[in-house]
């Protein structure tokens, strides 16, 4: 595999993860898109906002190709965890639009650079990993995006039982709600044998 082919493969996985995360918002009310469903506040629109923010940095300033918009929830002086939730003043359209503009900016960076193009991640410097290549950042961001797409899978299922990798079809076996309830009951029964251990 050539470097160009490897870059295309990594880029395809990145785009796939972007799509998987974004479709989890489809058909949801503003409330359901924003509401926290874990003790630490994980919410679908916040995940999209977070990914937009980190992508703007990793495919922007890291390679001296800064994203042209200022994101007040990123960087020095930003409110802690402000990148993980959406305020009442921020609309879904604002966040999704930003996500798409950041993706376009990232795509332009990926297309313009070679896999061995150097970059610097200032916030990684303390750990001695600050000097990076586009390949390292692509791998990092593929992992980051797929991780958050997995979070979104679970959050969306908690909201309305919607599952699957893509809007075009589920990657789960095709069974009705009754089958899934019985399946879940079997898992719970097996787990109960270890309750208190």
Task: List PLM regions with ranges.
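Short, contiguous pre-domain boundary segments
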Residues: 1-6
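Short, contiguous alpha-helical
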Residues: 7, 11-25, 30-80, 121-197
């Amino acid at each position: 595999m050539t470097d160009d082919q490897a870059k295309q493969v990594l880029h395809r996985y990145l785009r796939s993860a972007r799509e998987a995360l974004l479709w989890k918002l489809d058909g949801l009310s503003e409330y359901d898109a924003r509401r926290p469903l874990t003790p630490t506040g994980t919410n679908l629109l916040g995940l999209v906002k977070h990914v937009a923010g980190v992508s703007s940095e990793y495919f922007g300033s890291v390679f001296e190709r800064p994203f042209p918009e200022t994101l007040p929830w990123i960087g020095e002086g930003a409110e802690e965890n402000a990148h993980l939730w959406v305020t009442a003043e921020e609309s879904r359209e604002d966040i999704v639009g930003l996500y798409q503009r950041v993706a376009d900016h990232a795509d332009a960076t990926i297309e313009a650079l070679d896999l061995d193009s150097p970059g610097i991640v200032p916030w990684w410097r303390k750990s001695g990993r600050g000097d990076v290549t586009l390949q390292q950042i692509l791998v990092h961001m593929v992992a980051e995006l797929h991780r958050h797409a997995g979070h979104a899978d679970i959050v969306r299922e908690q909201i309305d039982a919607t599952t699957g990798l893509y809007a075009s079809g589920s990657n789960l076996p095709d069974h009705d709600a009754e089958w899934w309830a019985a399946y879940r009951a079997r898992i719970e029964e097996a787990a109960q044998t270890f309750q208190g251990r």
